[in-house]
Regions:
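Nucleotide-activated donor-binding/catalytic signature segment of Leloir-type glycosyltransferases, i.e.
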Residues: 15, 22-50
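Conserved acidic donor-binding segment of nucleotide-sugar-dependent glycosyltransferases
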Residues: 99-107, 114-120
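Short beta-strand segments
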Residues: 10-16, 39-42, 62-63, 84, ...
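Short glycine-rich donor-binding/catalytic loop of glycosyltransferases
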Residues: 64, 80-94, 103-105
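Acidic donor-binding loop of glycosyltransferase active sites
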Residues: 52-70, 78-81
Length: 152
C-alpha cells in the first residue's frame, strides 16, 4: 500500500482471527494506512463464501501450520488460483496446481501477488490446470489408510 497507493490490490480476510498471529493483527489494525485495501469478514454463509472465493484473483494461504487445508481445496474446486505456503498438507490437497512459497519469504509473496494481479504466466498456468483438479474423496483417503494399516 505504501508503494502502490490507491492501485494496491484489496486483501479480503475471510474467517475468524487465528491464534498466535498477534503481530499480523497489529499491522491490520492500522485502518488509516490500510483503509480500503484490507477488509475482514469474520463470518459468512456457505453461499457467500463460495462467491468471495470464486470471485477472487487468488486465494492466499501464508500459513505456518495447517490441519487439512480446506480453503485450498475449496478454491481449486471453484476455479480460483492458489498461492500457499509450501506445507505438505497443501501439496497433498492441491498437488502441482498451487504456487508454493516459503511463508517467511515476504519478498517472494509480494512479487507473486503482484504477478497474479497482472495475470502473469504463473496465474495463467494455474487457470489452465485447474480444470483437471481432482478433489480427494473419502474413498481415496480410506484406500491410503488401508494400505498403511496393512503394513502394520
Amino acid at each position: 500500500v505504501a508503494e502502490q497507493g490507491k492501485h494496491a490490490p484489496v486483501l479480503l480476510i475471510l474467517g475468524q482471527r487465528g491464534w498466535q498471529a498477534e503481530r499480523v493483527f497489529e499491522q491490520l489494525d492500522r485502518p488509516e494506512e490500510l483503509q480500503g485495501h484490507v477488509q475482514e469478514l469474520g463470518t459468512c454463509n456457505d453461499e457467500e463464501l463460495a462467491g468471495w472465493i470464486g470471485g477472487a484473483r487468488a486465494l492466499l494461504m501464508p500459513s505456518f501450520a495447517e490441519g487439512f487445508g480446506l480453503p485450498v481445496f475449496e478454491a481449486l474446486e471453484l476455479g480460483t488460483p492458489v498461492i500457499a505456503s509450501d506445507l505438505p498438507v497443501f501439496r497433498e490437497v492441491g498437488g502441482g496446481i498451487p504456487t508454493y512459497l516459503d511463508p517467511q519469504d515476504s519478498a517472494a509473496w509480494k512479487r507473486t501477488i503482484e504477478a497474479f494481479c497482472a495475470d502473469g504466466p504463473e496465474r495463467q498456468r494455474q487457470v489452465a490446470e485447474i480444470g483437471a483438479f481432482q478433489a480427494p474423496t473419502w474413498g481415496d483417503h480410506f484406500a491410503k489408510v488401508e494400505v498403511w494399516l496393512a503394513r502394520l
